[in-house]
Amino acid sequence: MASESDTEEFYDAPEDVHLGGGYPVGSPGKVGLSTFKETENTAYKVGNESPVQELKQDVSKKIIESIIEESQKVLQLEDDSLDSKGKELSDQATASPIVARTDLSNIPGLLAIDQVLPEESQKAESQNTFEETELELKKCFPSDETCEKPVDETTKLTQTSSTEQLNVLETETEVLNKEAVEVKGGGDVLEPVSSDSLSTKDFAAVEEVAPAKPPRHLTPEPDIVASTKKPVPARPPPPTNFPPPRPPPPSRPAPPPRKRKSELEFETLKTPDIDVPKENITSDSLLTASMASESTVKDSQPSLDLASATSGDKIVTAQENGKAPDGQTVAGEVMGPQRPRSNSGRELTDEEILASVMIKNLDTGEEIPLSLAEEKLPTGINPLTLHIMRRTKEYVSNDAAQSDDEEKLQSQPTDTDGGRLKQKTTQLKKFLGKSVKRAKHLAEEYGERAINKVKSVRDEVFHTDQDDPSSSDDEGMPYTRPVKFKAAHGFKGPYDFDQIKVVQDLSGEHMGAVWTMKFSHCGRLLASAGQDNVVRIWALKNAFDYFNNMRMKYNTEGRVSPSPSQESLSSSKSDTDTGVCSGTDEDPDDKNAPFRQRPFCKYKGHTADLLDLSWSKNYFLLSSSMDKTVRLWHISRRECLCCFQHIDFVTAIAFHPRDDRYFLSGSLDGKLRLWNIPDKKVALWNEVDGQTKLITAANFCQNGKYAVIGTYDGRCIFYDTEHLKYHTQIHVRSTRGRNKVGRKITGIEPLPGENKILVTSNDSRIRLYDLRDLSLSMKYKGYVNSSSQIKASFSHDFTYLVSGSEDKYVYIWSTYHDLSKFTSVRRDRNDFWEGIKAHNAVVTSAIFAPNPSLMLSLDVQSEKSEGNEKSEDAEVLDATPSGIMKTDNTEVLLSADFTGAIKVFVNKRKNVS
């Protein structure tokens, strides 16, 4: 029959609603037949078979009666009214099954409302894809038939009958589908999704055969559910917007796989337990211990190169997570300190400012104005210490710093009678007085030389140098002259450094104190820096040509870093021009001098004192300063490659020992930062806890596994380098006495072979800690370090350690006791030092050369070339192949002082059988 075929054809749309394609022009009647049957069967399976059949018969009778009664009225209506009537009946039937049964007889009333429905359906199209496509299907199918066929009574009655039957059956089917979903346990929120999944299964066959058609309006589904479950119809609107279109469900789980894929890419670059933000991880991420074997295969030696060092920004700010830490402005934007003002607004004078600052002596508890503390402060104090003193309002007197040494000296006369000691002292003074008088008499005959000799004897007795012009004495003497030597009381020898000699004096270049010196890894270059804001590079004579060729190679190729600073270009050009000269212009008398007398190059750019230096394995150099910046240099370039800005003074820096694309910086702002040089950013950072957050030292240990920092209050804090998380800490202090309060940490040096670290502090102590249990392995005493940034370091074979001192001596200890020299000694205490006196000011830095054979070969070969007299050293050279001398018993030592003098020592120990 025509009505049945029309109903079957129109019923194709509800099942095809989920296909989402464009609808065809032709009639999908064949497909609609199978679809209607599937929907009907699905509804019957739920268990409501009988009520549906009865509902069909009742509704059909009422439809026929209403059609006969109103047939004349229907003929007078417009075609579009008939078209919209089907939609009104569908909405009425969906809203309430009772209305669908009783109100169908009132067709004229329904037709009056049909004019509003198309506009409302158009609004629904923009809200939901399902609603839009279903509405289009309901509009188009009846209107197409109406336009193509002539309008007659029979056709319109048939269309009305089929449309009404369709709406009723559609409502019944949707109710049954919803009930089936409810039986399966869906809640209010999950019902729309369950209905979607159910329709997907029911119409699988249609999706395979039928062409793609637009989905239809699904607004009736939530309304029916709401009307059957709750009498209040206020809830249905939210569910109407809740169910998402069918296409999104497959796309909703799609994003998680993409995220997991990106995370897996990052996981391949780090260990699984690293908890680092993804923005901090790059393709060239920091090597970890677990990645060592894999990275060795891919990139045997990850290192920094000039291309990556010069790429990107020239000035990098210390921004963590995209913003300046703690909301502070970056260093380049920080305004200079404002001069304090009085209550009336007048600027205070320098005297008023100094008088207003009260500082406290930590040893005595005395508080004095800063203006009166100058005479009580230790001589040679550095500007960093003064800055910390102003911030902490604390200081340590020079006498208190030597308190333990005084106790040691006071313990000496306890073994002897006080009267006898006084008597010996008086006799010594009388003897010295006679010696001085005799020297005056000899001066008339032999001149000033005898006086200087007597003065040197006096200084050796008293270990003092008041008004002693020893520097002028040294200038007129050969560099092979032995220096003053002293040893600890009770240390009777044999000594290892009593025959040490000065072989070169590099004074006259630095204008002011030298705060730090560092050798390159190969031992051929020495970097020194300090108070004059300039970094100087000293090259060995036998390595000058190599580095000069390297520099000329880059200059001739025109490989200049982009936008170098003008002050760096101008200054370095003049400096390097004077330094670029042949190695034959040196003084022929300085045959034993290992370094060229003038610096290989000078790097200018810092605007305040330099505090620390660090070399990479391929000749990159980092310098940190009190101007709150870290600058990157390379030995082949004249200009600064990059500038890393900080918030406060940068007290310590260190290249990562295994991957020099990263470096560590410690600052007085309390933050430890791990910088990525190629990416020009802070890769990781952490902040020190506690009241005093001043970081005064930093380094790596265990071959880069841990980063260690030292603080002003005497703590050594360890961080896991992989993600810079806190690991453990050591409180560096004595158990009793004056040093039970932690003092400033000035240096941290690893002892690679034995898993230990060497810690220098301002309590005039050097401590060796075992990292396996954080126990104290050895404590070294004897030197004076109460307020300086003096730090101790190891010799090339870790047999000795050396440190400068505020008493103008260089102190050397054996790392471990030679038990053959002592009958009874504490294994965890080392008071047996050897001292060298070669400076007339505070020795601010002292280091061993990492490769002394490079320097000794020059010395020995020059002696061999003379051929006049063969020394024992030359005989040793003959016994060794390729002209390289054995260095097992030889050390090269360098020291710098508060006046800028740098001296080079060579020590050749006696052969021990």
Curated annotation (Swiss-Prot):
Biased composition (Polar residues): 280-311
Bias-annotated ranges (Acidic residues): 1-14, 467-476
WD repeats: 509-548, 605-643, 645-685, 690-729, 740-779, 784-823, 876-913
Comp. bias regions, Basic and acidic residues: 262-278
Motif stretch (FFAT-like motif): 9-15
Start and end residues of each stretch annotated as Important for interaction with ARHGAP26 AND ARHGAP10: 211-257
Modified residues (Phosphotyrosine): 11, 479
Phosphothreonine PTM positions: 158, 219, 271, 349
Predominant cellular place of this UniProt entry's protein: cytoplasm
Biased composition (Low complexity): 561-573
Modification after translation: Phosphorylated by ATK1; the phosphorylation stabilizes its interaction with RAB11A and RAB11B.
Stretches assigned to coiled coil: 119-184
Compositional bias ranges of the Pro residues kind: 233-256
Pfam families (UniProt xref): WD40 (PF00400)
Keywords: Acetylation, Coiled coil, Cytoplasm, Endosome, Golgi apparatus, Membrane, Phosphoprotein, Repeat, WD repeat
GO CC terms of this entry: cytosol; endosome membrane; Golgi apparatus; perinuclear region of cytoplasm
Region Binding activity, annotated ranges: 2-170
Residues that bear N-acetylalanine: 2
Region (Important for interaction with RAB11A): 334-347
Biological role stated in the UniProt entry: Downstream effector for Rab11 which regulates Rab11 intracellular membrane trafficking functions such as endocytic recycling, intracellular ciliogenesis and protein export. ATK1-mediated phosphorylation of WDR44 induces binding to Rab11 which activates endocytic recycling of transferrin receptor back to the plasma membrane. When bound to Rab11, prevents the formation of the ciliogenic Rab11-Rabin8/RAB3IP-RAB11FIP3 complex, therefore inhibiting preciliary trafficking and ciliogenesis.
PANTHER family (alphabetical): WD REPEAT DOMAIN 44, WD REPEAT-CONTAINING PROTEIN 44
Comment field on protein domains: The FFAT-like motif is important for interaction with VAPA or VAPB.
Protein name as it appears in the record: WD repeat-containing protein 44
Source species: Homo sapiens (Human)
Gene: WDR44
